[in-house]
């Protein structure tokens, strides 16, 4: 079992005070477990899970498959009513609230770790445009009742590295 980053690196970041969150990884061999099998198992212990592929431009297969489970925070916004965990607020600018959350949970990018070590996963609906660009008049009826924003903050991530398997 290999842990990254080193204890010395963790101490240096902690002493610098630049980040409240430090990603730490444990490398395990997963010869017999596929990402789909891992997701199936995660769904047995967490009601909120995701699977995200990292396919880059013009690649047929991406290097990583990311799975997340047990979100730390649930964030939704509908009609300027935002819910962050158990806190409800009225806001004209949900993107500002999201930037504050991202700043609070910002972590360093470490070269020995996968490019995604946690963060927000979910969606912004088409109707989110009304917050980002108020000059665009969206006269649409929301017959589906989708939330304008539905995100979850994940700090538990499993990364399958297909190049190293």
Where on the chain are the PLM-derived regions?
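Signature of the chorismate-utilizing enzyme
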Residues: 1-165
């Amino acid at each position: 079992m290999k842990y990254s980053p080193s204890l010395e690196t963790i101490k240096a970041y902690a002493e610098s005070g630049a980040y409240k969150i430090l990603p730490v990884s444990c490398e395990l061999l997963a010869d017999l477990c596929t990402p789909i099998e891992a997701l199936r198992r995660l769904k047995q212990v967490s009601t909120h899970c995701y699977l995200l592929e990292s396919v880059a431009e013009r690649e047929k297969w991406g290097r990583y498959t990311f799975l997340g489970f047990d979100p730390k925070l649930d964030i939704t916004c509908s009609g300027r009513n935002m819910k962050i965990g158990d806190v409800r607020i009225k806001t004209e600018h949900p993107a500002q609230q999201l930037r504050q959350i991202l700043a609070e949970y910002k972590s360093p990018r470490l070269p020995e770790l996968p490019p995604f070590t946690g963060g927000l996963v979910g969606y912004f609906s088409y109707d989110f445009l009304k917050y980002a660009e108020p000059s665009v008049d969206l006269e649409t009826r929301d017959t589906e009742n989708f939330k304008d924003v539905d995100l979850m903050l994940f700090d538990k991530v499993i990364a399958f590295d297909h190049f190293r398997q």
